Amino acid sequence: KNMITGAAQMDGAILVVSGADGPMPQTKEHILLAKQVGVPNIVVFLNKEDQVDDDELLELVELEVRDTLSSYEFPGDDIPVVPGSALLALEALTEKPAMSAGENKWVDKIFALMDAVDSYIPTPERDTAKTFLMAIEDVFSITGRGTVATGRVERGTVNCGDVVEIVGLGDTREVTVTGLEMFQKHLDESVAGDKVGVLLRGIQKDDIERGMVLAKKGTITPHTKFESQVYVLSK
């Protein structure tokens, strides 16, 4: 469920597959889940290239990955596939954190991977003009400060001091946004696309949970009847 929760908020993904072992059962499961929750673009990293002595074997793994992606309606023939070794790149960067391109072939492959991400996965247009809406992914408490709800802002903007509604399970409740934080930086405003922690006053941790939403007052109403599409994964 954690994979689904995270994937549902992604603009794109890097699929990591062992170049030595090829796609595993969980690889196909992750591709399926990415498709069902609407991840629009995928870039592939063939890890552990250093453990593969035969270039033809690595090519076969790449073909298998492309075929698997195509079978789940991703454009397997067009998706960038970058081989490399995350471990050797990490070891090199640990020794020399400020390494530049051209100094180490394994680090260069990580640069190539990120270039592929930048070129293949487009920057999405953010819907900042509509009213604020954020699906709650997780909740925790900060002693002496209040309750924090985390998630991605789906649309609109939210500012410190705004009064918003918590909608979902139970009665709709009003709360005040007293703080915003993203990547350990405090913000005055958060906009659509931000993965943010929202500090709330007027509610306890036990009264809010994953699946509920934060929204501008009066813009969202809960429903008890709806149509849905359900995918059941067999073990």
From Swiss-Prot:
It is found in: Plastid, Chloroplast. Transmembrane segments: none annotated. Pfam families: GTP_EFTU, GTP_EFTU_D2. Keywords: Chloroplast, Elongation factor, GTP-binding, Hydrolase, Nucleotide-binding, Plastid, Protein biosynthesis. GTP binds at N47, K48, E49, D50. SUPFAM superfamilies: P-loop containing nucleoside triphosphate hydrolases, Translation proteins. PROSITE patterns: G_TR_2. InterPro entries: EF-Tu_GTPase, EFTu-like_2, EFTU_2, P-loop_NTPase, T_Tr_GTP-bd_dom, Transl_B-barrel_sf. GO terms for molecular function: GTP binding; GTPase activity; translation elongation factor activity. One of its GO terms (biological process) is mitochondrial translational elongation. The keyword Zinc does not apply. GO terms for cellular component: chloroplast; mitochondrion. Residues 1-125 form the tr-type G domain. It catalyses: GTP + H2O = GDP + phosphate + H(+). Belongs to the TRAFAC class translation factor GTPase superfamily. Classic translation factor GTPase family. EF-Tu/EF-1A subfamily. GTP hydrolase that promotes the GTP-dependent binding of aminoacyl-tRNA to the A-site of ribosomes during protein biosynthesis. This is Elongation factor Tu, chloroplastic. The lineage of its organism: Eukaryota, Viridiplantae, Chlorophyta, Mamiellophyceae, Mamiellales. The gene is tufA.
